[in-house]
């Protein structure tokens, strides 16, 4: 496509570059073409991507190159340095670089000056102190060619760019450490350590990265069918309301001992409240189910969708995945439901293939954390969000699994929200393309500066 040719023309003269292309605009194909054009100058390709995408990337390489299956080696959990076959393409899970020393060491043994390194979904290395970021940046330092790619390079602020650009080259931004970068571009809260309140000199950063970045939005380069939205509401049961209020009171009791809340505290509060409106509560390590109406509402929505349509159901919690899958199988049969979640890659890949190719597999039940990045699910034009992420970026990523190149029909997204609950705050934040956690934390900070006693009212209003 024209925009892919533009990307190649811009980045081919440089040894390092970034494809900041919207989801569904063909980043993977563009990256593969860049590799092919440099194949005489490199000995191998190390392609790092989310674990859930490894099989997708393998299929794309087979589709768009002359490589055979033997030319591609996909790292697994048990891959070790002394058992890596010779290959041209190596596909490695990003999560494994931080979670498995064995895999990290095995990957490290493959880096040399003639290696082309691709980091697919480079938002995974935006944390400058994260183990995977530090390892990959160090490993790739001597590699001649480096490419990063993501549709969401910035989710929190310009600080997200630092580590991604440093991976390519510290010379791009001109700072040898995050602290020198922060001193010139970030303003921190005077009392809340680490809380960024303002960014400065953004034009300087934009100018520094411009020669190395190709950026395009879906609206600029594609004519895709429209997105359609629908919302279905429901109320809590009495048991849910009782647990919901109890969870808020337990959280507030902490104020008696510690008036300072961290982002983790607020995350735990939001997670507890959201889990309750999803029908369970992990209270002090004890899991208990609670009667609820969310699953009933889901089944009502499914009944309204034409029988021949495939449907993606996005859930957030493993409890919900099990409950949804059980209910759908009971009504539509065991073969009708595929699940995409958990750590078993082979199982995930098999389930995904079944959803894509088996006409009798109507549902794909997946978590946004596992399936929300990189997958192509254009077989479905209906997606139901059983429970939403707190972040707009996660929601957008999940939406664009169905709404991308290859989709020829309008895609309908149906959200399930519980009235008079945390769901309403999440819905409001997502409508504003924001972060529900960050928005609540800002409210807490404002209240604390005026009247700390109002914090209780703020929490009880959730």
Kindly label every feature range from the protein language model.
Residues 1-20:
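Conserved pre-motif I regulatory segment
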Residues 43-44, 63, 85-86, 116, ...:
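Conserved P-loop NTPase motor "coupling/switch" region that bridges the ATPase
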Residues 73-80, 93-99, 126-129, 315-319, ...:
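Conserved helicase motor
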Residues 390-462:
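A conserved SF2-helicase RecA2
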């Amino acid at each position: 496509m024209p925009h892919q040719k533009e990307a190649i023309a811009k980045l081919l003269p440089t040894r390092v570059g970034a494809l900041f292309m919207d989801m569904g605009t063909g980043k993977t194909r563009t990256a593969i073409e860049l590799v092919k054009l440099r194949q005489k100058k490199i000995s191998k390709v190390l392609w790092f991507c989310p674990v859930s995408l490894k099989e997708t990337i393998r299929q794309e390489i087979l589709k768009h190159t002359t490589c055979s299956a033997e030319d591609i080696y996909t790292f697994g959990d048990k891959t070790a340095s002394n058992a890596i076959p010779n290959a041209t393409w190596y596909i490695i899970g990003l999560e494994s670089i931080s979670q498995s020393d064995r895999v990290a060491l095995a990957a490290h043994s493959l880096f040399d000056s003639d290696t082309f390194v691709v980091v697919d979904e480079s938002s995974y290395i935006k944390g400058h102190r994260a183990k995977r970021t530090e390892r990959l940046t160090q490993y790739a330092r001597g590699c001649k060619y480096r490419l990063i790619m993501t549709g969401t390079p910035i989710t929190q602020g310009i600080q997200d760019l630092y580590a991604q650009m440093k991976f390519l080259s510290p010379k791009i931004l001109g700072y040898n450490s995050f602290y020198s970068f922060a001193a010139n571009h970030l303003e921190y809260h005077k009392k809340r350590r680490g809380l960024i309140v303002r960014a400065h000199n953004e034009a300087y950063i934009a100018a520094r990265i411009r020669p190395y970045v190709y950026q395009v939005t879906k609206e600029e380069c594609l004519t895709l069918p429209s997105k359609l939205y629908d919302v279905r509401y429901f109320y809590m049961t009495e048991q849910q309301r009782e647990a919901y209020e109890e969870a808020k009171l337990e959280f507030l009791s902490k104020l008696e001992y510690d008036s300072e809340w961290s982002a983790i505290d607020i995350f735990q509060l939001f997670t507890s409240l959201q889990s309750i409106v999803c029908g369970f509560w992990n209270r002090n390590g004890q899991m208990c189910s609670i009667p609820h109406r969310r699953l009933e509402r889901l089944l009502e929505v499914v009944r309204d969708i034409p029988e021949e349509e495939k449907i993606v159901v996005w859930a957030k919690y493993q409890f919900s995945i099990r409950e949804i899958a059980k209910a759908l199988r009971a009504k539509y049969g065991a073969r009708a439901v595929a699940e995409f979640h958990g750590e078993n890659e082979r199982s995930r890949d098999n389930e995904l293939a079944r959803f894509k190719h088996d006409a009798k597999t109507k549902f794909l039940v997946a978590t946004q954390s596992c399936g929300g990045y990189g997958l192509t699910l254009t077989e479905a034009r209906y997606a139901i969000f059983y429970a939403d992420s707190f972040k707009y970026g996660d929601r957008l990523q999940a939406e664009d699994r169905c709404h991308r190149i290859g989709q020829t029909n309008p895609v309908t997204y149906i959200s399930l929200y519980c009235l008079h609950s945390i769901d309403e705050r999440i819905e409001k934040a997502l409508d504003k393309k924001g972060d529900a956690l960050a928005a609540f934390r800002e409210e807490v900070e404002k209240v604390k500066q005026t009247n700390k006693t109002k914090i209780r009212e703020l929490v009880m209003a959730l």
